[in-house]
Amino acid sequence: MKTSSFESASSSGGSGGGGGGGGGEGSGSFNLRNLSKLILPPLGVPAGGHAQSGHAGPNDRRVISPLDSRYRCWDTFMVVLVAYSAWVYPFEVAFMNASPKGGLEVADIVVDLFFAVDIVLTFFVAYIDSRTQLLVRDRRRIATRYLSTFFIMDVASTIPFQGLAYIVTGEVRESPAFSLLGILRLWRLRKVKQFFTRLEKDIRFNYFWIRCARLIAVTLFLVHCAGCLYYLIADRYPHREKTWIGAVIPDFQEASLWIRYTSSVYWSITTMTTVGYGDMHAQNTVEMIFNIFYMLFNLGLTAYLIGNMTNLVVEGTRRTMEFRNSIRAASNFVGRNHLPPRLKQQILAYMCLKFRAESLNQQQLMDQLPKSICKGICEYLFLPVVKDVYLFKGVSREVLLLMVTKMKPEYIPPKEDVIVQNEAPDDVYIVVSGEVEVIYSDGEAEERVVATLGTRGVFGEVSALSDRPQSFTLRTRTLCQLLRLRQAALKEAMQSKPEDSVVIIKNFLKHQIEMHDMKVEDLLGEDAAGEYDHGNIPCNLLTVAATGNSSFLEDLLKVGMDPDVGDSKGRTALHIAASKGYEDCVLVLLKQACNVNIKDAQGNTALWNAIAARHHKIFNILYHFARVSSPHHAAGDLLCLAARRGDLDTLRELLKHGLAVDSEDRDGATALRVALAEGHADVARLLVLNGASVDRAASHNEQQAAAAVSVDELRELMKTRELAHPVTIVVDSPSPAAAAVIREVGSSGDSRNGRRQSARSDGAHWPRVSIYRGHPFVRNRSSEAGKLINLPGTMEEFRIIIEEKLKVDARKTLIMNDEGAEIDSIDVIRDNDKLFIVTEEHMTAVASMDSVSGS
């Protein structure tokens, strides 16, 4: 704990306390005893700099700090002497005619000598300026202040006037004047008041008992003074038998001192407490007048005592009264709204628990303390529990401290739902004490307890780490103390140290595998969990990719896990995500530069898995990256693989995506050539019908083709296929998230392992269109084939391509869609559009056809 600021503050008040004592604060120690001695420096002023007022001189060392421990002892001793002096003065005046004898006389002289020493000592005691709250140590200012305030009264209360009279006259005189001058001794009672005020602020003592002691001392002193004064009236009255005490004790002056004093105090107490037994009462007018004023004074004193005691008692029961009022209000609320008994019990149980927990003042206290102290408290209270939780085993102390400082302790009553099934909680809970039931319900059957969490159990981590709703209801079985940690705080702590984040995630995955009493589907989902048994679930990206949980997958990749790790079958996370249609997971993996060309044990790439499972959007995204990394062989590799396997369905899907049917693979073979070599006649026919070049393939496969389908048959098939056969493209436009990933990855250049290469400058999807020569209304009568091209970025580039492909003057042509609408902007053309290039001849032909049909 940092105590430098406290030490400097206390040392400013205690250092330099030589002469009268410089211990205590000057030692630089800090404890509860020194806490009440702190002097706060002004705002913006260093504690050791200007916390003192005045200029230090050569005599500054003899100035005593009022906060010095030795001076405090002296001051306490003076309080004892003041109490003695205040008690003995009324007694001597009333019962000894102000002329003490024997031991009392000697004691009075000794006490007066001590008070004289205190007067001299006060000239060397620094003081705290009431305006600036600074310690003034300048002796000149100290002397000036004392002489102008308390000096005269202190001297007057110390002078032995009767002794001076004896020295001057040589006679011992008993005069009322000496008794009146003796009243000045009561001036010293201010020290007692200051003493009790200081004790009330000292946290080492109980405020209630200090306050009670103060009230009792005030009451007893007033009883003593009133009794002495009442006896003095009776003793000085000329007709002593007509006094309050003379009526009871006729010759009271001859009675012992103890009987007389006891009788006086007895009368004073019975009168003050308004009991008034009547055995001792006023017998003359003077006593009656005194009683009148005494009883009026008692009214005020009684009100003062009752008010103080009431405040002390009520303050102690205030919380209980507020609690009872809140319970009454809650009961009325339940009754008005006809809530069921179960809810009523939960409400009342929560309020009772809250009342009991408030006595600890945990959070309220923590909010008042500085961060360093809070950290120490949390470390002492929570760290021993948190470090043993399975989720945080092996995590560094630094990250653990970061988390425990953000944990909030809570008390939850029994039978309270902390997390409801299918809810996505925002917090992670750690069980410190009590038991929590894990309950499953399918909505129709009764609830079933599948597990019980005890001390150091944790729940809510599934939602925090995998962003999945909680598959179970977590309900307290007994009174539970829980530590609540916000998900945001957990993720912030994990991001602060990536290696600890890996440890937490591995602990989480390992624990989920070992939980035989829980369903694996809670983590993987029903489909993914079916692929693994409970004892053989890989704790890596493959498991998370199978869940489709892109957020958790991204967390794993950010902490450094390899995106290209494979299972026993060679499948990577991209293979699994692509085959299951998890587009978000695919995008996350692509952002982390995974290799799209990795093949599994069966020779399948993620691109093949996507098209085989008919996930066209994912195929479109992956094909973009495959074509970037292998621009000349991406299409050929896929078509040849489908042809080699004789997979007609997949081949049709590939052709629907507009892949060039004569594309070559890495070995220079086309799909038709592979189909002929493998003897897949149906595949060969499909390829020919979709525009494959027979002559190009036949030159390499004359012998193989004879076994399956003849080249002549294929050439004959070419004649029967539809001329200008258009390709029907089913590629959807990329989603905004996919387009963002394409732009991000495409603009980042080379990545790790050299797998990612630059894409198009605009980073967008490659739209392709079919262009035909002729008017769309008469296109079916044309015998000229169309062309499938990549759409350029501008209309000027588009017209240049038209001139090259269709051999027409593009400046004198119109571009129309299949509905006959003219297109004059490249921005309105979409992927898979069919465009028609219309010349003047085509327009004339259409006009002539309209005139003939009209006639």
Curated annotation (Swiss-Prot):
Domain KHA intervals: 768-855
GO cellular component: endoplasmic reticulum membrane; monoatomic ion channel complex
Subcellular location: Membrane
Membrane topology category: Multi-pass membrane protein
UniProt feature, compositional bias: Gly residues: 13-24
Keywords: ANK repeat, Ion channel, Ion transport, Membrane, Potassium, Potassium channel, Potassium transport, Repeat, Transmembrane, Transmembrane helix, Transport, Voltage-gated channel
TM helices/strands, residue ranges: 76-96, 106-126, 150-170, 180-200, 215-235, 286-306
ANK repeats: 536-565, 569-598, 602-631, 634-663, 667-696
Topological domain spans for side Extracellular: 97-105, 171-179, 236-262, 283-285
Domain of life of the source: Eukaryota
InterPro entries cross-referenced by the UniProt entry: Ankyrin_rpt, Ankyrin_rpt-contain_sf, cNMP-bd_dom, cNMP-bd_dom_sf, Ion_trans_dom, K_chnl_volt-dep_EAG/ELK/ERG, KAT/AKT, KHA_dom
Annotated Low complexity bias: 1-12
Pfam family, one: KHA
GO biological process entries: regulation of membrane potential; response to abscisic acid
Molecular function GO labels: identical protein binding; voltage-gated potassium channel activity
Binding site for a nucleoside 3',5'-cyclic phosphate: 391-511
Span list, region Disordered: 1-24, 744-765
PROSITE patterns: ANK_REP_REGION, ANK_REPEAT, CNMP_BINDING_3, KHA
Topology feature Cytoplasmic, residues: 1-75, 127-149, 201-214, 307-855
Intramembrane-annotated stretches: 263-282
Entry domain remark: The segment S4 is probably the voltage-sensor and is characterized by a series of positively charged amino acids. The pore-forming region H5 is enclosed by the transmembrane segments S5 and S6 in the Shaker-type (1P/6TM) and contains the GYGD signature motif which seems to be involved in potassium selectivity. The KHA domain (rich in hydrophobic and acidic residues) present in the C-terminal part is likely to be important for tetramerization.
Annotated family: Belongs to the potassium channel family. Plant (TC 1.A.1.4) subfamily.
Function (record text): Probable inward-rectifying potassium channel. Assuming opened or closed conformations in response to the voltage difference across the membrane, the channel is activated by hyperpolarization.
Subunit and interaction comment: The potassium channel is probably a homo- or heterotetrameric complex of pore-forming subunits.
Name under which the protein is recorded: Potassium channel AKT2
Biological source species: Oryza sativa subsp. japonica
Lineage: Eukaryota, Viridiplantae, Streptophyta, Embryophyta, Tracheophyta
